Swiss-Prot record:
It is found in: Nucleus. Keywords: Hydrolase, Kelch repeat, Manganese, Metal-binding, Nucleus, Phosphoprotein, Protein phosphatase, Repeat. This is Serine/threonine-protein phosphatase BSL3. Expressed throughout the plant, with a higher level in younger parts. Phosphatase involved in elongation process, probably by acting as a regulator of brassinolide signaling. The lineage of its organism: Eukaryota, Viridiplantae, Streptophyta, Embryophyta, Tracheophyta. One of its GO terms (biological process) is brassinosteroid mediated signaling pathway. Mn(2+) 2 binds at residues 743, 775, 828, 907. It comes from Arabidopsis thaliana. The active site is at residue 776. Kelch repeats lie at residues 138-184, 242-290, 295-345, 351-398, 419-465.
Amino acid sequence: MDLDSSMVPENDQDPIATSENQSPMEEKEEASEQQTGSESESASLTPSLPPPSQQQQQQQQQPQVTAVVGPRCAPTYSVVNAIIEKKEDGPGPRCGHTLTAVPAVGEEGTSSYIGPRLILFGGATALEGNSGGTGTPTSAGSAGIRLAGATADVHCYDVLSNKWSRLTPYGEPPSPRAAHVATAVGTMVVIQGGIGPAGLSAEDLHVLDLTQQRPRWHRVVVQGPGPGPRYGHVMALVGQRYLMAIGGNDGKRPLADVWALDTAAKPYEWRKLEPEGEGPPPCMYATASARSDGLLLLCGGRDANSVPLASAYGLAKHRDGRWEWAIAPGVSPSARYQHAAVFVNARLHVSGGALGGGRMVEDSSSVAVLDTAAGVWCDTKSVVTSPRTGRYSADAAGGDASVELTRRCRHAAAAVGDLIFIYGGLRGGVLLDDLLVAEDLAAAETTSAASHAAAAAAATNTPPGRSPGRYGFSDERTGELPESAPDAVVLGSPVAPPVNGDMYTDISTENAMVPGIRRTSKGVEYLVEASAAEAEAISATLAAAKARQVNGEVELPDRDRGAEATPSGKPSLSLIKPDSAVPNSVIPAGVRLHHRAVVVAAETGGALGGMVRQLSIDQFENEGRRVSYGTPESATAARKLLDRQMSINSVPKKVVAHLLKPRGWKPPVRRQFFLDCNEIADLCDSAERIFSSEPTVLQLKAPIKIFGDLHGQFGDLMRLFDEYGSPSTAGDISYIDYLFLGDYVDRGQHSLETITLLLALKVEYQHNVHLIRGNHEAADINALFGFRIECIERMGERDGIWVWHRINRLFNWLPLAALIEKKIICMHGGIGRSINHVEQIENIQRPITMEAGSIVLMDLLWSDPTENDSVEGLRPNARGPGLVTFGPDRVMEFCNNNDLQLIVRAHECVMDGFERFAQGHLITLFSATNYCGTANNAGAILVLGRDLVVVPKLIHPLPPAITSPETSPERHIEDTWMQELNVNRPPTPTRGRPQNPNDRGSLAWI
C-alpha cells in the first residue's frame, strides 16, 4: 500500500561537515570559546543586517534614524557523525518516523544523571518496489513506502555523548507504524495514530515513560469517541495542558477536524472543537508546533486535490474557552508537505518537504524560519517578501551542499536548546539514515528591534486578513510601549522552551494581558464559604485588636487610619506627599518588571506527563472547627527532655547537609523526622538570637531572589533551588541574597523540612538569607492547618507538641517586612486600611503574637488587593469578617507617601505564580505549585538584579506518578492525614476567581 506518489531517484552524496564522533553540544562549546568576546552575550546574538535594498529604503524613509538589525536568516545544517557501537543501535535508513526531544533526568554529575535525548520511534525501513531501504525503486513512478517494513522500534540519541542506542522498554509496545504522531510531555513521549502492515493504527494513546532507569510503555485509557484511526495528521501539547490532534487522512479523505484532550481533567476524554476564524482546509502531511505561550502553529500540508499548501495558521484559546484560528503573517517561501517543523523559542524552523509529482522543495527555500516575533518568513538568504521561484525539478542535483542536505521529505526534526536536529527521510527514492544539526543563534533575539526591522519588508506584502500581531504573532505591544519608555512594565513576546526545561514565555494565553484583570471560573458561588477558612481562625484576634484600638491601648494617629479617615472609604488626597507624587501610569525610573518570565516545563511521572489532579470548585467547603494544641503541662514535661547539650553550630550544618539536595531530595520513606527536639531547640535558639538583633523592617540590597508562600511543599522549594540556583557555596549565595515572604508551614506534607532548612540557612548565611513573617507563622493558625498535626505525627505527641510550641515562639521574633534599595517593599499580606507609612511597621515591637498585635499587624499579614484595578478604595475581604481588600488607589498612595516604586507581597495563590496589580506597582507572589493538590497553579520566584529589573521565574506542578496512582497503598500511607485536613479545611481559593456577580450587592456576611 502506497501512502504517496513516487520520488524520482537521484544519486546524491551528502557532505560530512562535522568532525568524527563529536557531539553537537561539544562543537557548540568549542565554537563559543573561539569567538572573540565570548563572554558577552550580546556579541554572539547580534542579528544580520537586512538586504542592501531594504537598508537603502529604510534610510530614505527615515534619514535621521540609525538602521536597526532584522531577523536572522535560516541556519545551515551539517552532518553529525554519531557513535553507533552495534548495528542495531542505529536507526538506519527510514522515513515516516517521529523524533521527539526529551529533557534530562536526575542530578547532573551523579551516576543516575541522563542528559537530554532524542527519541526516534517507528517509521518505514523499505520502499515499494525494492527490498532494501537504500536501493533504487524498480519503477520511477512508484516509490511509496512499503508498509510491511514499518517498525515499532525505539532508538535513543544521547545529545551529550553523541551516541545512538536501541531501547527495549517494558510493557506492551504500540503496533508497527509510520506516518504517526508523537509529542513530548516532560520526560514522556505520547504516540498516536499512523498506518502499518495491518492498515490504519487504532486511535489509542501510547505513552513511553522515560522517567525511570528503564523505559516502559503504557496505554492511556480515554473515554468516549475520539479522532478515530488516521495517519498523516499532527499532534502537539498546547499550553502544557491540551493534547491537540488535527487533520490527517482516515483512509478515505483528508480531514480538517480539531480534537483536544485536557490532561488536567480526569477521566481523560477527547473533545471535538469548533474553532472560530479562518482555519486550514482539509489536509494531511502538515506540521504542528506549539509555542510556549499556548499558540499552536500549523504549517503547510497537502489538500484534498493533492495540492501543496503554503499558509501557516495559528490556533489559540481565549480566556472564555473559545478556540480561534488566524492566518499567520508573512509570505512563505514555498508550499510544501511531508516536511518537518519545530519551534526554537519564537522561531519556527521548517525543513525540506515535497511538492508532488516527484518534486521537492529546493534551493534556499528548503530551510525556512517563521519568526513569530517579527511576523516574517526567512530563508537561508533573507526575509521573504514573495514566494521563491527557484528550481524545483527532481533532477536538479548539486548546488549548495547545505541545501542538498535538507532536500528531503518524510523526515523528522526536534530541538534541544538552540540546536535543531533532523533525522532520515526520503530523497529521490532513497531512504536516508543521516543525522543533521543546525544552531539557531537568533533564538533569543525576540526583540522589538527585530519587529521594527521586519515591518518594512512585511507591511506591503501582508495579504488582507493577515494581521500581524494577532495572537502574538508579532509584538504588537511595541507600538504601545516603545523602547523610549524603559520603565513601562511589559510582558514581551513568548519564547518557546529548550528541552532542558527552561523557557522564556509570555505569561499564558489564558491570562489577561492587562495587569490587574483576572480569569473567572464557574462555581464562584462556593468561594465565599471556602475563603472564610483562615479568617475564622483569626476573627477573635482581630476583634481584640479593634477593641484595644477603641480603648486607646494602641495609639494610631489620624494618618495611620488610612481609608477609615474619610467617609467615602477612600484615602484622603491630603495624605499624598506633593514632593513624591508620581504619575499612576508609569513606574518611576529604576524598578522594572522584565518583559519575559523564565519557566520550567512540567516534569512528569504519570501516563501523560503534564497531567495534574484537579478538583472542581464546587468541592470547596467552609473550614471546620479547631483542634486542641496541647496543654502547658505537656509542654513543660516535654521541655525536660532537653537533658543533653549540643554544639550550636553543628545542628545547622547537619540540617543543610541532610536537606539541601536540590536535585537529589526525595520524600523520606519513613515519616519519622530526622531531628529530635534537642536539636530543634538548639536550631531555634541560634536563629532566634539572629532575628532578635534584626530590625522589624529589614534593609536589603540587590541582587536578591524573592520567594512567596511555600506551605510545607518542600519538593517545590528544592525544584526552585535546582532550576534557579541554591543558597550554598556551591550555588549562588556568594553573589545574590535570598528573601522569603512567610507562610513556611501548614497545608503541605513537609513543613518541618521547610522551616528547619530555612532556619539553618539563616544561621549559616545570616547576612544573605532573610525571612519575614506570614499569617501562618502563628499558633492559632498553624494549630488548625497542618503544622501541629505534622509535628505530632512525625515526632510523637509529647515531643511534637513541644517542638510546635518552640517554633511558634520563634515565629514571634520574625521581621515583618523588608525594604530593598529603599525602592521596593516586601511584605506578606498588604497595606490594608491602616498602613500609610513604613514607619508604622517599623514601630511594631517584637516579639509579638497575633493576639497582642494591632490593626496594623492584621493588615500587614492578612489583607489582599481588590479583585482588579477597577475596584478602588476598601472592600470587605472574602476571607472573613473584619478583613479588607485594598484598591490600586491605596497602592499608589502608599508608594507616593514612602517614595517607593513597587510592593511585593505573597499570601494569595495565583495561577501563574505571580500576578501584577495597580498597573504593575504591586506583585503577588506564590511559590508552591498545585496548592493543596487542587489549584493546578504554577509556582514562581522573583529575581531582582542590580539594575532593579524584576525577572519572574516559574515552575509547573508535577503530575502524580504513574507508578503510584492516587489509589495505591504508597500514596495512601504518605498523605492520608493531609488529604483529610484539606477536605475538612479547604484552602482559600486561587486569586482571580471572583465572587458571583449576582451576590456582589449582598455583603451582609462580612
